[in-house]
């Protein structure tokens, strides 16, 4: 059972009565065949549900209205099987508030060269029916995605599936509640922002809860529940001698388990799926939540440190998008550099809170060590290295008049040396196109020091995210050149200024 089981995507066929009952019967038959095949063979993340043909303005408007009010409907996939005059779609599209994808396909893959006649031509008109639909979308400034390809093509399946993930994620985001335990780290700028504007734009709400409210729940956790969770730790991780039974840090592990159980109970009771903490506001907690946060992220919660609610929300959104995909997604911070000509590297980490979903396959190490920040007892944490391969780091920032999403494509590499004195999980990567270009572009665009790191998602996913939410995206990859990047930022300033 995943979040995608809670949603469905409606498959809508556009046509008209001009072609007669027999043509419409064949259109319906084709649509049923295509939907059944896609549900069976395409490995889509959620189910396609075929709706009645849209052959008149009233029918189309009714479908769009029903989609808006059906909580299970994540979006619409539209196929213009025949020509469907686009003025029929205006009223429906004008009220539609769910994501929209045009599947530009046709029932047959190859032309029947020897038998093709005008009946065939009239039945299979995607080539120009799709263009008519595209015009009205452009005329109405309607955000919608387009996938072109035969319905049996695996590349088309992959792209439809990726769009479905965006559609479901958008619906989940409209219900997302972000809990901030305490406020921002004092005097930090980028983690702050306009929470009202964020709720208007994305749909998620952000509210603060006193740490004392959390402490009450934490203190109510029973020893029996703690013992059961400790047993899970024992089977899942490699415990250092200090954290094992009779070890001098065993009580710190028990306290970490108490905090984890309390945090999870608090989040579940409040319906929260993302949260923040800050080391400057820990009154009543015996240690900074480290292990607890790591494990909650692995369970799908969004998180960011120092009150950074934008990154916490983005992490939850990206975890929903990547559900079931290979690779993990985590809170991350660009921490320190390795400057070496031709081999510049970034070491990413945080004080404690890196998600084990990005870890290498062997068991993480559970340890308790001193943390000089926060003034509390030594916290428990999981220590691991990260899987290698292509990845992205993404940052969502508030520019006052709009949101900007920054994405840097990176290549995660194996740590060339052991890190015996580094007591935190970490990731090592090469930034594309190179560290000087990537860091300078990131800084010029205002990117945060906190990011969401993902092996599971790629640049195309984040482009779709930006498009579906109508926000600016700034991309740093192997094609980036600083003069052109600076120009793009200037052009975006003008473009989004005109849109206000």
From Swiss-Prot:
Residues that coordinate or bind Mn(2+): 306, 333, 350, 450
GO biological process entries: L-arabinose catabolic process to xylulose 5-phosphate
Keywords: Arabinose catabolism, Carbohydrate metabolism, Isomerase, Manganese, Metal-binding
Domain of life: Bacteria
Cofactor note: Binds 1 Mn(2+) ion per subunit.
A single Gene Ontology CC term: cytosol
GO molecular function, one term: manganese ion binding
Pathway: Carbohydrate degradation; L-arabinose degradation via L-ribulose; D-xylulose 5-phosphate from L-arabinose (bacterial route): step 1/3
Pfam families: AraA_central, AraA_N, Arabinose_Iso_C
Cofactor(s) of this protein: Mn(2+)
SUPFAM superfamilies, alphabetized: FucI/AraA C-terminal domain-like, FucI/AraA N-terminal and middle domains
CDD domains with a match to the protein in the record: L-arabinose_isomerase (cd03557)
Keyword Metal-binding carried by entry: yes
InterPro entries for this protein: Ara_Isoase_C (IPR024664), AraA_central (IPR055390), AraA_N (IPR055389), AraA_N_sf (IPR038583), Fuc/Ara_isomerase_C (IPR004216), Fucose_isomerase_N/cen_sf (IPR009015), Lara_isomerase (IPR003762)
EC nos: 5.3.1.4
Function summary: Catalyzes the conversion of L-arabinose to L-ribulose.
Record family assignment: Belongs to the arabinose isomerase family.
PANTHER family with a match to the protein in the record: L-ARABINOSE ISOMERASE
NCBIfam families in the record: PRK02929.1
Assembly and interaction partners: Homohexamer.
Descriptive protein name: L-arabinose isomerase
Top-level taxonomy: Bacteria, Pseudomonadati, Pseudomonadota, Gammaproteobacteria, Enterobacterales
